[in-house]
A protein has these predicted regions:
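Secretory/organelle targeting and membrane-embedding segments
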Residues: 2-64, 68-383
């Protein structure tokens, strides 16, 4: 391992070229180059240009952290520049949520188990909730976060990608190309967000953070209702929520079923809920109705949980898994230019004149109460 200091600019590459030359001498040839741009997004363009100007683009791969653009226009400008330096096959736009083993379980459990897959549609499901609350504050990320906010940092990236994992049609195969195509086809069916169905919030002590203006309007919370215009999902709301300084930390996908029909319909039987816990090694929970103990045939709610720790041996951390995929050329968990463009089209209404006002919420609460209305009468499964 070598360290190349001194910065990296078009005008001055620092010591990077010397370090690469040393590696070439040791290896007896040019090493494979992987440029991992885990840098502020404002530095993407100039760093990409520097890679080109110093002759480091040909035959290499480039990994870009989120956010890859901050709007449709800035995404298009950045992508045009990137494609002037790299071919699309060289570019990997990383989203570590897709690298989580538990996230990848969404499509595998669905397609491999008829028990779940046959019920995965509007015929059986009333609502899908994707919930990623955090108890943490913004810590030492004041400058980045105040320029970005929760919606841009999390909604158009992680939550949209998880929604696509849930909603995609069965791919032609489990190859990288077919998985990526299936996920991005459903992103193109995301209806542009309706600002009237979006709630933005800011935790009360946010403006007391060093580096944050007293009048900051940055959102630290977002909840949104997303509609997907495909035959499978038409009429089923996907309700997405994430935020800082909330009452609990979790990463969950909850598939809420329609009420059962038949002789128990009027007895108060609870809805079935299938929950994918994406945290850590992951788990699957099923809420179901069972008989309440006693002489009468009364319903009671029970939950069964399948922890996946017993099959987690050998699991790699998300970034390790994704960087391995980059090195081996597996693009199944990365977003193409077209897929990200579709995500920004769906997100665009939140960046216009109708963007909702930011509502203040108490630290360690569940966020603005107005977000409860997005779930209709079902309420948040995580509360």
């Amino acid at each position: 391992m070598r360290f190349a200091g001194g910065g990296f600019l078009k005008s001055d590459p620092g010591s990077l070229l010397d370090v690469i030359a040393e590696a070439e001498a040791d290896l007896g040839g040019r090493p494979a180059l992987l440029h991992y741009l885990a840098i502020p997004p404002t530095a993407f363009a100039r760093t990409t240009e520097a890679i080109k100007d110093h002759g480091l683009a040909e035959g290499s791969k480039a990994v870009y952290e989120k956010p890859y653009g901050t709007s449709t226009a800035s995404f298009q400008d950045l992508d045009e520049l990137v494609h002037s330096v790299f071919d699309e096959e060289q570019v990997y736009r990383i989203d570590h949520f897709l690298g989580k083993e538990a996230t990848q379980n969404l499509h595998l459990v669905r397609f491999a188990n008829r028990l779940f897959g046959d019920a995965w549609s509007a015929e059986h499901l009333a609502q899908v909730q994707i919930d990623v609350p955090e108890t943490l504050d913004i810590d030492d990320r004041a400058e980045f976060y105040d320029e970005t906010g929760a919606a841009l940092d999390m909604l158009v990236t992680h939550l949209f990608q998880v929604a696509a994992e849930v909603a995609m049609e069965p791919p032609l195969s489990m190859s990288a190309e077919d998985l990526q195509a299936a996920r991005e086809a459903v992103i193109s069916a995301f209806r542009p967000l309706d600002p009237a169905e979006v709630v933005l919030g800011q935790y009360r002590t946010y403006r007391q953070t060093e580096g944050i203006a007293d009048d900051s309007k940055t959102d630290t919370y977002v909840a949104a209702r997303l509609w997907i215009d495909t035959d499978r999902w038409r009429g089923v709301p996907f309700v997405l929520r994430t935020g800082k300084k909330l009452a609990a930390s979790a990463q969950r996908v909850s598939l809420i079923f329609r009420p059962a029909e038949g002789p128990l319909h009027s007895t108060g039987a609870h809805r079935n809920v299938l929950v994918f816990d994406l945290h850590g090694n992951g788990a699957i929970e099923i809420d179901m109705t069972v008989k309440q103990p006693g002489p009468e045939p009364l319903p009671a709610e029970g939950t069964t949980r399948l922890n996946l720790e017993n099959i987690a041996e050998g699991a790699m951390p998300p970034y390790t898994s994704l960087l391995y995929d980059v090195l081996t050329g597996n693009r199944s968990l990365f977003t193409s230019s077209a897929g990200l463009a579709a995500a920004f089209r769906a997100f665009a209404p939140l960046q216009g004149d109708q963007r909702p006002e930011v509502q203040i919420y108490e630290d360690d609460s569940w966020g603005p109460e107005a977000a409860d209305a997005l779930t209709d009468q079902l309420g948040w499964h995580l509360h």
